[in-house]
């Protein structure tokens, strides 16, 4: 089975490998090995790969996997260790992928939950007790941001650094496990991130490594959609590949780079409907995540986002998006506020953060000279932290993984577009775009 899987990997996936090099005078550490996970048989009913995600107002979705197909999909929870005052009933699914058969994947929504509160929970009446902390109901709130994670030594370093920061929600703009058809790597990824993802909600969108389609045999995103169910139904979407959520004064939109996005697509129609409901008094900050960057001065993946940008950028600009996070390019880059290919004080800041630790290495070659809209760029592994201090100001910091120490390498204070007065200039433009058929 393993040999067959390796052959499938070789024949069906194409990896573009970029070696690392110094940005300016920084000397980069050497690449690290792919993590190895010894295969170990556990009790078939013990919950594995536990992670949580936001699931509508005051609710969380708890996801876990068991090998026992008869295990129930309920979660017991409460505010004291070992004392479970509440019970949430859920659903389960499973999938097949050639010779692989997944375990039973459970999804259970719990709540309503109090904000900024620790809850203790147990999955399916078996196994260890876990705990989670709900996000605050108001500012300040901190997001951890890292994309293109994979399962390498650098991934582990990134996760260790994220674990040290006091974040409330993790944002991941695509490329999670780098399973690339080898389905057991979804299982090992779930185990790798469980210590963090079972405690704080992880909100993710898809990247190219989640597609895993085999023509006429396996549809796209089968593994991703089965394992990482996001609140698409709660946000009025008909696809797990695009959705939105609100938390503590922030409206976050997760878009799909690998599903239809033209103005006649379901995604575009949903996006218009979602933006029409945004209340900037309740959620003064508006952020967007997707995988393929629109503003990218790295040599890697040039122009791959151009078509999506042509379709969606005018709508995002008219709506006053503050920040756009992307991945895909295995490096870090931050722009000025931009729109239509040039600096614009009323456009969003674009941040590429595809440097979480993937196995393909770093993309170190950049365009020279750099575009006028590019502020900071470096090919190093790391993560970002976005602290929304209040309704008007946010602090963004990028932390390089430097000799196992989380080095703060880039930071900037951001003023919300609501506070800057930009949105007062374009209400008619936005209404016109939202009303277009």
UniProtKB/Swiss-Prot annotation:
Pfam families the UniProt entry points to: Metallophos, Metallophos_C, Pur_ac_phosph_N
Enzyme class: hydrolase
Residue positions with a glycan: 390
This enzyme's EC code(s): 3.1.3.2
Needed cofactors: Fe cation; Zn(2+)
Subcellular location(s) per record: Secreted
Record's cofactor remark: Binds 1 Fe cation per subunit.
Binding site for Fe cation: 148, 175, 178, 330
Gene3D superfamilies assigned: 3.60.21.10, Purple acid phosphatase-like, N-terminal (2.60.40.380)
Catalytic activities: a phosphate monoester + H2O = an alcohol + phosphate
Signal peptide region: 1-23
Record has Cytoplasm as a keyword: no
Keywords, in A-Z order: Glycoprotein, Hydrolase, Iron, Metal-binding, Secreted, Signal, Zinc
Similarity section: Belongs to the metallophosphoesterase superfamily. Purple acid phosphatase family.
Quaternary data: Homodimer.
Protein name: Purple acid phosphatase 18
């Amino acid at each position: 089975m393993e040999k067959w899987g390796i052959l499938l990997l070789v024949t069906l996936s194409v990896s573009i490998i970029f070696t690392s090099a110094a940005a300016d005078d920084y000397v980069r550490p050497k690449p690290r090995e792919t993590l190895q996970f010894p295969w170990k048989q556990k009790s078939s009913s013990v919950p594995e790969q536990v992670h949580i995600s936001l699931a509508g107002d005051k609710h969380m979705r708890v996801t876990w996997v068991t090998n026992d197909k008869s295990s129930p999909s309920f979660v017991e929870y409460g505010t004291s260790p070992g004392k479970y005052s509440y019970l949430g009933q859920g659903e389960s699914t499973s999938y097949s992928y050639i010779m692989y058969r997944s375990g039973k994947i459970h999804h259970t929504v719990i709540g309503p939950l109090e904000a900024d509160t620790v809850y203790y929970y147990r999955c399916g009446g078996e196994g260890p007790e876990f705990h989670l902390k709900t996000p605050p109901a108001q500012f300040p709130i901190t997001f951890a941001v890292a994309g293109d994670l994979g399962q390498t030594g650098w991934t582990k370093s990134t996760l260790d650094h994220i674990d040290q920061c006091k974040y409330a929600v993790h944002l991941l703009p695509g490329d999670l496990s780098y399973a690339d058809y080898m389905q057991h790597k979804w299982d090992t990824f779930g185990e790798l991130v469980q210590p963090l993802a079972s405690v704080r909600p992880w909100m993710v969108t898809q990247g190219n490594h989640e597609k895993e389609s085999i023509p006429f045999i396996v549809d796209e995103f089968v593994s991703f959609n089965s394992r990482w169910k996001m609140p698409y139904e709660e946000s009025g979407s008909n696809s797990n590949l695009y959705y939105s959520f609100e938390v503590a004064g922030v409206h976050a939109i997760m878009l799909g780079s690998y599903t239809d996005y033209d103005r006649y697509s379901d995604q575009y129609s949903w996006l218009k409907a979602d933006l029409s409901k945004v209340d900037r008094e309740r959620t003064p900050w508006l952020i967007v995540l997707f995988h393929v960057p629109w503003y990218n001065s790295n040599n890697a993946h040039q122009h791959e986002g151009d078509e999506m940008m042509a379709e969606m950028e005018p709508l995002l600009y008219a709506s006053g998006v503050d920040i756009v996070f992307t991945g895909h390019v295995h490096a870090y880059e931050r722009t000025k506020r931009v729109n239509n290919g040039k600096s614009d004080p009323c456009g969003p800041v674009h941040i590429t953060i595809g440097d979480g630790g993937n196995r393909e290495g770093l993309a170190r070659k950049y365009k020279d000279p750099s575009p006028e809209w590019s502020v900071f760029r470096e090919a190093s592994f790391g993560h970002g932290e976005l602290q929304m201090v209040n309704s008007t100001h946010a602090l963004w910091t990028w932390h390089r993984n430097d000799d196992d120490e989380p080095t703060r390498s880039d930071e900037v204070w951001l003023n919300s577009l609501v506070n800057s007065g930009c949105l007062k200039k374009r209400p008619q433009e936005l209404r016109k775009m939202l009303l277009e058929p």
